[in-house]
Amino acid sequence: MTSHDVRDVLNLPSDHAGPRPSKKARTATPRPNLKGLAREVQNLGGDNPIAIVPEVSIFKKRRTVSRKPAAKWELKAFTNSARGDDGALVLRHWKRKPDGTVQDGSAEGQDSAATADNSADKPEDSSFAKFNVRVSVPQYSEDQYNTNLKHPDWTKEETDYLLELAKDFDLRWPIIWDRYEYAPQQPEGETPDGMAVVPASKPRTMEDLKARYYEVAAKMMAVQKPAQYMTRPEFELYEMMLHFDPKQEQNRKRFAENTLKRSSDEAREEEALLLEIKRIMARTERFNEERRELYNRLDYPASESDINSFKTSAGLQSLLQTLLNVDKSKKRKSIMAPENGVPPAAAAAAATAALPPAAAAVAAAPEVPPAASRRESLAASSTAGANDHHEPPVREPPVRHERQESRSHHRNESRSERADRHGAHGHHHRDSVSQTPATPAEAPTPVPAPAPAANKKKGPQQPERRKLSEHEEQVYGVSHHDRLGSGPTFRYEKINKLYSHKSGQQQMRITNLLLELDIPARLIMPTAAVTAQFEVLWGAVTTLVDLRKMSDKVDAEIKLEEAKKAERERAAREAAEARGETVEKKGGEEEGEGGGADDKQKDGGGAGGDDAKDKSGESAQADEQKNDQKAEDAKAQKEQQGEGQDQQKKGEEGLVVPIKEGGGEKGQGDAAAAATAAEKEAESSSNQPKIKEEADENGSSSGAGASSGARQHKRSASVLSNASDKSTKKQKK
């Protein structure tokens, strides 16, 4: 705030008593009065209004006047030489006078004026006379007419008259036909009656006039220049005039006249008919093409060879694969250059010659349409493998679950045989990605692609790609795979994945086996070649470990079956011996009882009827005791069988668990332990009959003791046999 403002607020007088200077007055400019849309547009500008260009009220731009003197025009006479009247008609028109006229009175000026007067007296030719082009009609002599142009319906005079009219009216045929009035000449001499003879003129149509003129022109054109020396336009004109047909021209005009006279309904109907005809023609053409293709496929040379080899399923499958290979090799264009200078056509011929006669005859069938691009065989390797191993080849296309089964079934064999193939031929290059792994052991047999058919279409043919050698593929890093992975991976990670799919015991065995071969488990420099060879070695080692495991499993099963067989034989032998001893004991007891009775009878010598009754009662009681003892033995035997079954269920775990291999991963030690347990059980069961025999020899007469020995023996045999049978069933599952 300044002192002046403070004084003003406090109403104090200023230091300077003089009047305050007045502000500069602003000039009030008239604001444009906008209305309607212009005002709305102006308001959109806000603080920065849009600049509006003022309207200019100028009606017409001022004319630029030249300061040169005005040009002079003069009325001059002219004639038209195209009329052919030698300048009889003289016309006049205004023409601009040329500049540079001399106005002084010198001699040169007088001479130029005199020349101008002379030129003014003689009218000039019209500038449009140069556009008058005369038609050149054929010219001929008397001899040429008599030789080439004679016609029974035309005379030479009438032909000359026609050519004159054509020349005068520039081949405008409607005018020529309208002005054509030929009157034949009267014959010389007088008739016997003294009357004049007036020959009648023949009526001529426009087509007759055209036909005669074109005939004369074509023949004279051929006389002046033979057809073999004519240029292409000249020969086309010659052919057109020579083949002019007056009847066809009349029909064309009549058809055009009728077309112009038809109604709108007839025009629409005719248009619909034309569309239907086009549709029918297109359908007929397509049908003819398909029928021609079918005929070409069915038309094949008859085979004279024996067809017995194709009556079996294997022969038919082999023939199918051969035909597929030949068909694909014909349809697929080769992407590789011919090797050793052998053209693809010669290679295809050699491949067809190598086929069986019947297959070659079928393969020689023509193909429609002719394929410009031929494909290589996609199933050559699978066919070769099927022929080498006498197995039915894989069907094309393979089913998914069949592919998985064949892959799991031939995994071990494919690894070992792939190792041989890699070692002998380096990296295997596959021509097809659809080859199934069911027959990976065989090396692929590439079928050379035949030469592509000559491409008659316009445009240059694409060059074929050159095939790289093995060294070039190694240099450029080119490789071929059965299938591509999900993404980029490191080679050592790829090797680690091989270990991750195995159990700990199998990993330990594989590692020990590799250490025996002086090969580290982790590669130091895993290049592509080293990794491939390591995968081959890994496959061979895995196959060897699996075979060892299967061998141990089979050995354990053999030992178990032998122990079961020995136990069955021992049990049968002991049962037979026990039956023989029982019969002998029963016979001895009966003999002893009979002898005692005789002695008593002898000692009694005359005993009464009471003693006899007592003795008979005692014998009856002895028989009842024997029967009771037999019943008790049978009952005890049934109880032994029931107890044996209970002990068998309880002992299954003890006998079956050592035999199981823990998911297929335990080795020889578990099988040996199972065999040892079986032998111990057999020995313990075999000791039971010995104890029984010792008890019998010591005079043990108690039936319970004898039955207990037999019970223990039968129990051990039944438990071992039943447990072994159930363990065998579980192993089979």
Swiss-Prot record:
Residues 371-384, 699-710 have a biased composition (Low complexity). This is SWR1-complex protein 4. It is found in: Nucleus. Residues 1-34, 98-128, 371-488, 564-733 are annotated as: Disordered. The gene is crc-1. Component of the SWR1 chromatin-remodeling complex and of the NuA4 histone acetyltransferase complex. It comes from Neurospora crassa (strain ATCC 24698 / 74-OR23-1A / CBS 708.71 / DSM 1257 / FGSC 987). InterPro entries: DAMP1_SANT-like, Swc4/Dmap1. GO terms for biological process: chromatin remodeling; DNA repair; negative regulation of transcription by RNA polymerase II.
